[in-house]
Regions:
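Beta-strand-loop-alpha-helix segment that lines the small-molecule cofactor/substrate pocket
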Residues: 183, 189-190, 194-242, 256
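Bacterial N-terminal signal peptides
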Residues: 57-67
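Boundary at the C-terminal end of the N-terminal hydrophobic targeting segment
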Residues: 71-73
């Protein structure tokens, strides 16, 4: 039996990269670092110290930009350890560049969309979008041509015209050069999320990126700067923020039913044994598939956003509070190593991702966040989603329920049979009474149609509908680039913590000083009269588009005969 140590790149890839570009750049970086360390000992001025630090960060980003594409996926962001705490560098906002907080753009009455990545999730997204008025699918792209072509049948079923097809390793680059696309919807493997998004943003397109949208700090800061400088939306497609229970719980928290929410839990605990073989493999020699391969090479919570996203909105992160300090711990790999061996016949002596990873985060306002990641051990599906407030408690897994103080609900106009606080969940009857007054406006607006269209019980459809709604009405998106940064940073920051003996890591302020500019998380809505006019125009466009599509497919069938 062969034993192999798992590394970020295969041996031949590393050798080629080192020989051609990485080694010279690394030596250059090391040279400047040695100068920095020598000079810093004699510096007394804090301002001068900071300038040198910013120079080092800029140099690191320049080096990263010149590296081969596959090195973008590495954990390599510069950091220091000060008084036992790991502090990553925060690059200065370039001169003339403005924050993207509350970013709005001109209304887009008809959202022209291109889909990139049509394997597991992409086709379902195409199908959902055919139910949304005021959209036009302009392009379909996948590494495998047949996958992209297959999605034409979805458009045909919806009586929408065929879209242009792109395929191959660089198909997305040609797609992004088009000028008739408003939004690029990205559902590729993880390593291509950033690459496609970067290309799209550079060509002036808004992007919606599947989770996790960025795999490391380099990609995170790059997306922030692109969104800010280009004034383009960067939305992470975190569907769990749109699940019915989470939306209703968020609404209750915003209305004060939980008092002050002080402790929250979230997770992605989902044993993936039925799915490992479904992940795309790049040729016959790829025995692992992209997701298991990634887990073998990277430590940390590499899939944090399903658990973190919904609870982050409850805590108003970068809207009055911010993540401050992170500590992570993990088990070693047990089942992960066995999966590797079963698929390759080789024993991986250094399978990076532990079977179970736990991350604790404290916030500026004294709250605590607990996040779990486990895709390796047998257990029921569990995103945890637990909110502990000074006046109430919410829990979703494994038991779904609310435990709220009777006096709080009485003030809110909800009469219940008894005080459940600290003892048991509300009865089914009292929960129904509660939801009559505290069902989220989002659920009221989209819930019934979402159940019909589907997509993880309807939450995917609500997510897509809200994205289109905000673009059509010129509103800020529900999830911005700073949400993306905060929710995705757990991977590299957690790895830093664990690789340094579980030291605390200072979570950077991705807004660069503006985290308290807005007070409280809110969904944006247009004025009723504006909303009605926008929807009427969208419905009319779709009616005409479907008439055009019906003629197109009738002719296509006739030509085929």
């Amino acid at each position: 039996m062969t034993t192999r140590a798992c590394v970020g790149l295969e041996d031949n890839e590393w050798q080629s990269a080192v020989n051609s570009r990485i080694l010279p750049l690394f030596l250059l970086f090391s040279f400047f670092l040695s100068i920095f360390e020598a000079v810093i000992k004699n510096i007394q001025s804090t301002e001068t110290m900071n300038r040198l630090r910013y120079f080092l960060v800029a140099l690191a980003m320049a080096v990263a930009a010149l590296l081969p594409v596959n090195t973008w996926a590495q954990f390599n962001w510069p950091y220091t350890i000060q008084n036992g705490t790991i502090i990553t560098q925060v690059p200065e906002r370039p001169a003339g560049q403005q924050s993207a907080l509350g970013l709005t753009v001109e209304k887009i009455p008809v959202v022209r969309v291109a889909f990139v990545g049509l394997g597991m999730r992409g086709p379902d997204a195409v199908e959902r979008w055919t139910h949304i008025p005021g959209i036009e699918v302009k392009a379909l792209c996948d590494h495998e041509r047949d996958r992209a072509e297959a999605c034409q049948n979805i458009l045909r079923k919806a009586s929408m015209p065929a879209a242009d097809v792109y395929y191959g390793e660089n198909g997305y680059k040609d797609l992004c050069k088009r000028t008739d696309i408003d939004l690029v919807y990205i559902a590729t493997d993880w390593l291509h999320h950033y690459l496609v998004a970067h290309e799209a943003l550079e060509h002036g397109h808004h992007v919606a990126i599947e989770v996790p949208s960025a795999m490391n700090m380099t990609e995170i800061w790059s997306l922030i700067n692109l969104s800010e400088s280009k004034r383009l939306h960067v939305m992470m497609l975190e569907n769990c923020c749109y699940d019915f229970f989470e939306l209703n719980s968020l609404y209750m928290a915003q209305r004060g039913l939980l008092g002050e929410v002080i402790y929250v839990q979230g997770a992605y605990r989902h044993e993936l044994s039925p799915y490992w073989d479904e992940y795309w493999k790049n040729g016959a020699d790829d025995q692992l598939g992209w997701r298991l391969d990634y887990n073998s090479k990277f430590r940390g919570d590499v899939y944090p956003t399903h658990g973190l996203g919904p609870i982050a909105q409850v805590l108003n992160l970068h809207r009055g509070d911010r993540m401050r300090t992170l500590v992570a711990m993990d088990t070693r790999s047990f089942n992960g190593q066995e999966l590797f061996k079963a698929r390759t016949g080789e024993y991986c002596s250094d399978f990076k991702n532990g079977d179970h990873t736990t991350t604790l985060i404290s916030t500026e306002k004294g709250k605590v966040i607990e996040i779990h990641h486990n895709v390796m051990t047998p257990q029921p599906y569990n995103r945890m989603y637990q909110l502990t407030g000074t006046k109430g408690f919410v829990n979703k897994y494994p038991v779904e329920g609310f435990a709220l103080a009777k006096d709080v609900m009485a003030k809110a106009g909800v009469n219940v049979s008894k005080d459940y606080t600290g003892h048991s969940y509300l009865s089914k009857e009292d929960t129904e009474v509660l939801l009559k007054s505290f069902t989220s406006p989002m659920v009221l607006r989209y819930g019934e149609e979402a159940k019909e269209v589907g997509g993880h019980g309807g939450m995917d459809f609500i997510m897509d509908s809200r994205l289109v709604y905000c673009l059509q009405n010129g509103l800020p998106l529900d999830i911005d680039v700073y949400d993306l940064a905060e929710w995705c940073c757990l991977a590299e920051l957690g790895s830093l913590s664990m690789n340094n003996g579980n030291k605390p890591v200072q979570v950077p302020d991705f807004t660069r000083g503006e985290w308290s500019r807005f007070r409280g998380y809110r969904h944006a809505w247009a004025k009723p009269e504006d909303e009605a006019a926008t929807r009427a125009a969208a419905m009319e466009f779709t009616k005409q588009l479907k008439a055009k599509g019906a003629k197109y497919w009738k002719k296509a069938s006739k030509d085929a005969d």
